Amino acid sequence: MKKMLALLVIAPLLVSCSGNKGNTDNEEFLKDTNAFDILMGQFANNIENIWGINEVLIAGPKDYVKYTDQYQTRSHINFDAGSITIETLSATNSVASLRQAIITTLLMGDDASNTDLYSDANDIQISREPLLYGQVLDNTGQAIRWEGRAASFADYLLQKRLQKRTSGLHVIWSVTIQLVPNHLDKRAHKYLPLVRKASERYGIEESLILAIMQTESSFNPYAVSRSDALGLMQVVQHSAGRDVFKMKGKWGQPSRSYLFDPEQNIDAGTAYLSILKNSYLAGIENPTSKRYAVITAYNGGAGSVLRVFSSDRDRAVGIINNMSPGDVYQTLTTKHPSGESRRYLNKVNSAQKNYRR
């Protein structure tokens, strides 16, 4: 498994029109961001000290990574590639460490609110409705829901598929498990009832919600980013989260545990799409042009979308309204200052077409 040193420098968060808030909010944002930056730096240092500089692996939007056993063992689910890799450095209890990690990973639920991905705490909750149920088949071709079947499969893997490699001075023992080919569709289907509920509540297309979830997290409920965006729809507490709470008449911003709850995350992400659609970008008349603007704004902020067309917001809306949807799409995917935002519109738009079928 290819390892990459995680980027730990926290880039400034790209927020929507909510960026024009007072100094108090900005000070709170900087305080929280600096604290998260320090936490990430300490966490990466712990991993580097134990695994080595070339083996630093940290959770991301589409990668679940959990360390246990004093950082000696880790579980990595690559939700994009559809693979699970369980590894350990333990020289004396390698088989036992791997066995426990395999069982726990196969049976964990999708509520990440009580799991700390930035520590070695053994806090993973086994669920009667495992996140990976139906996405992993054991050696007999059966889905895994209960501990007995997970334990039997773990024993099979350790007997038949145990691998050994060296990295620097370390010997690393590992087992790799492939998810079923349609794992992405299975995760999407799992969240469809929650998506439908949010779609009806906020008037946002189901296909758009699903496309954003796929692009943001590949339907990983444990998703985190280096800018501390959280959960399935990668909601940032200090910007989108604060706007959503304001819309709901609540003070402050959602907690991390709030955004790690799948239902609340999907609700918050969809509510923010409705804010972009009906408030920040309400003046855009053509529904297709507005959809392109909303998608791009979800990634890079409504203000940056409008500035692509003019520094004056009212004039920007007028320019957009005088353009065809195709020209709006072309402009946003070629002239937006953020390469990530340019690519984001293309990815979400393509994914949405698949969910409309």
Swiss-Prot record:
- Which residues are annotated with the lipid modification N-palmitoyl cysteine? 17
Q: Name one GO molecular function term.
A: hydrolase activity, acting on glycosyl bonds
Which first-to-last residue range defines the signal peptide?
Answer: 1-16
Q: What is its EC number?
A: 4.2.2.n1
Renumbered to this chain, the positions carrying a covalent lipid of the kind S-diacylglycerol cysteine are: 17
How is this protein positioned relative to the membrane? Answer: Lipid-anchor
Q: What positions belong to coiled-coil segments?
A: none
A Pfam match is Mltc_N
What GO terms describe the biological role, i.e. biological process, of this protein? cell wall macromolecule catabolic process; cell wall organization; peptidoglycan metabolic process
Q: What is its EC class? A: lyase
Cell compartment(s), UniProt:
Cell outer membrane
Q: Which PROSITE patterns match?
A: PROKAR_LIPOPROTEIN (PS51257), TRANSGLYCOSYLASE (PS00922)
List GO terms (cellular component aspect): cell outer membrane
State the source organism's domain of life.
Answer: Bacteria
Predominantly, its location class is: membrane
For this protein, what reaction is catalysed? Exolytic cleavage of the (1->4)-beta-glycosidic linkage between N-acetylmuramic acid (MurNAc) and N-acetylglucosamine (GlcNAc) residues in peptidoglycan, from either the reducing or the non-reducing ends of the peptidoglycan chains, with concomitant formation of a 1,6-anhydrobond in the MurNAc residue
Q: Which InterPro entries match?
A: Lysozyme-like_dom_sf, Murein_transglycosylaseC, Murein_transglycosylaseC_N, Transglyc_AS, Transglycosylase_SLT_dom_1
Give UniProt keywords alphabetically: Cell outer membrane, Cell wall biogenesis/degradation, Lipoprotein, Lyase, Membrane, Palmitate, Signal
Q: In which family does this protein belong, per the annotation? A: Belongs to the transglycosylase Slt family.
What HAMAP family does the record tag this protein with? MltC (MF_01616)
UniProt function note: Murein-degrading enzyme. May play a role in recycling of muropeptides during cell elongation and/or cell division.
User: What protein name applies here?
Assistant: Membrane-bound lytic murein transglycosylase C
